[in-house]
Design a protein with these regions (language model features):
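Single transmembrane alpha-helix segments in multi-pass membrane proteins
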Residues: 3-55, 60, 76-81, 223-230, ...
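Loop-to-transmembrane alpha-helix initiation sites
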Residues: 10, 86, 113, 133-138, ...
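Alpha-helical transmembrane segments within multi-pass membrane transporters and channels
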Residues: 21, 54-94, 99, 244, ...
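Membrane-interface helix caps of multi-pass small-molecule transporters
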Residues: 23, 48, 72, 76-81, ...
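Helix-loop-helix "hairpin" substructures at the membrane interface of multi-pass membrane proteins
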Residues: 70, 130-215
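Transmembrane helix-bundle core of multi-pass membrane transporters
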Residues: 85, 89, 96-153, 183, ...
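Cytosolic-side transmembrane-helix boundaries in multi-pass membrane proteins
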Residues: 165-172, 176-179, 239, 251-297
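Transmembrane alpha-helical segments in multi-pass inner-membrane proteins
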Residues: 192, 196, 202-267
Length: 297
């Protein structure tokens, strides 16, 4: 039971990051590599702040804000300096590597030791550690989905979505496209850093390399959600990403259960899985077209 709860909790935690990836990948139509630097940034900030005596909840908020600053930098590089989106993420990611190490006191990883975390504080109310992680992960996912759903129904949210759908049309209607892109970058990377901070508190340490593969997990969760469940409102789509993240996590756990698996091949399996997941929508289209042709014959 604890194993199942732990797996669900980890999937729910990943879903927060996946929603951040969704905002740039689907809403803004941008492949943002900043995620791989924002994730360990959140972890580095929360661990260093907790060790400095900051309340874990405040430290988690600082991690969220740090991620938004990283998103601001990426947004400025992309919109004001006209650096292509993919290269923008790589530039910010490279810079964040050094920044994250400096935040952690010039060491590549930093342990929380016996310091308080948001999960330990919840567990002190009578919950087991697994129940505390699951409860807070679910609460965070629901809160993020609620806030973003409400935001997307406001004028700012509608403008943000139109920016990703049709830039020329948005500009023709007087929308400041650059500002909207920057806002999208900030929200996205803020959520990714928040996820990194929660993972660091759950794992008990931060590591400068913890963001490696983050974009793979996020994209996989988003595509799995889209393949499994179609035609949803924005709120439903955000919630479905949580399901996608859980499914992805369960698939990865099954890969780890393969007998005599060489651990060096795990990332190869991850890459193959992502390729298959990305191909799934195209496969669905081909099968649908083929089915229509057979009916017409």
């Amino acid at each position: 039971m604890n194993f199942v709860l732990s797996s669900l909790s980890e999937g729910l935690l990943w879903s927060i990051m996946a929603i951040g990836v969704y905002l740039t990948f689907r809403i803004l139509d941008i492949a943002d590599m900043t995620a791989e630097g924002a994730f360990p940034l959140g972890a580095a900030v929360v661990v260093s702040q907790i060790q400095a005596g900051t309340n874990p909840w405040i430290a988690t908020l600082f991690a969220l804000l740090a991620g938004m600053v990283a998103g601001l930098v990426s947004g400025m590089l992309h919109t004001k300096m006209k650096i292509p989106a993919l290269l923008t993420g790589i530039v910010t990611l490279t810079g964040l590597y050094s920044i994250n190490i400096k935040i952690m006191g010039s060491v590549p990883n930093l342990s929380l030791g016996d310091s308080a975390t948001v999960f330990k504080q919840l567990a002190s109310l009578g919950l087991s550690n697994e129940e505390a992680v699951f409860s807070l992960s679910l609460a965070c996912l629901l809160l993020v989905c609620l806030v973003l759903t409400l935001l997307m129904k406001t004028e700012i949210g509608l403008v943000l979505r139109s920016t990703g759908d049709n830039i020329p049309m948005s500009e023709a209607n007087g929308v400041n496209v650059d500002t909207m892109k920057i806002v999208g970058y900030m929200i996205s990377n803020g959520l990714i850093a928040l996820c990194g901070s929660l993972f660091a508190q759950n794992d008990g340490f931060s590591d400068v390399t913890s963001g490696t593969g983050t974009i793979v997990v996020g994209l996989s969760a988003v595509i799995i959600a889209e393949v499994l469940i179609h035609d949803l409102t924005i709120g439903g789509r955000l919630l479905s990403i949580g399901i996608g993240a859980i499914v992805y996590r369960l698939i990865i756990l099954n890969i780890y259960e393969i007998p005599n698996l060489d651990q060096n091949l795990v990332r190869l399996f991850n890459a193959i899985l992502l390729a298959l997941v990305l191909f799934a929508p195209e496969l669905q289209k081909r099968l649908k077209i083929r089915g229509l042709k057979l009916r017409n014959e």
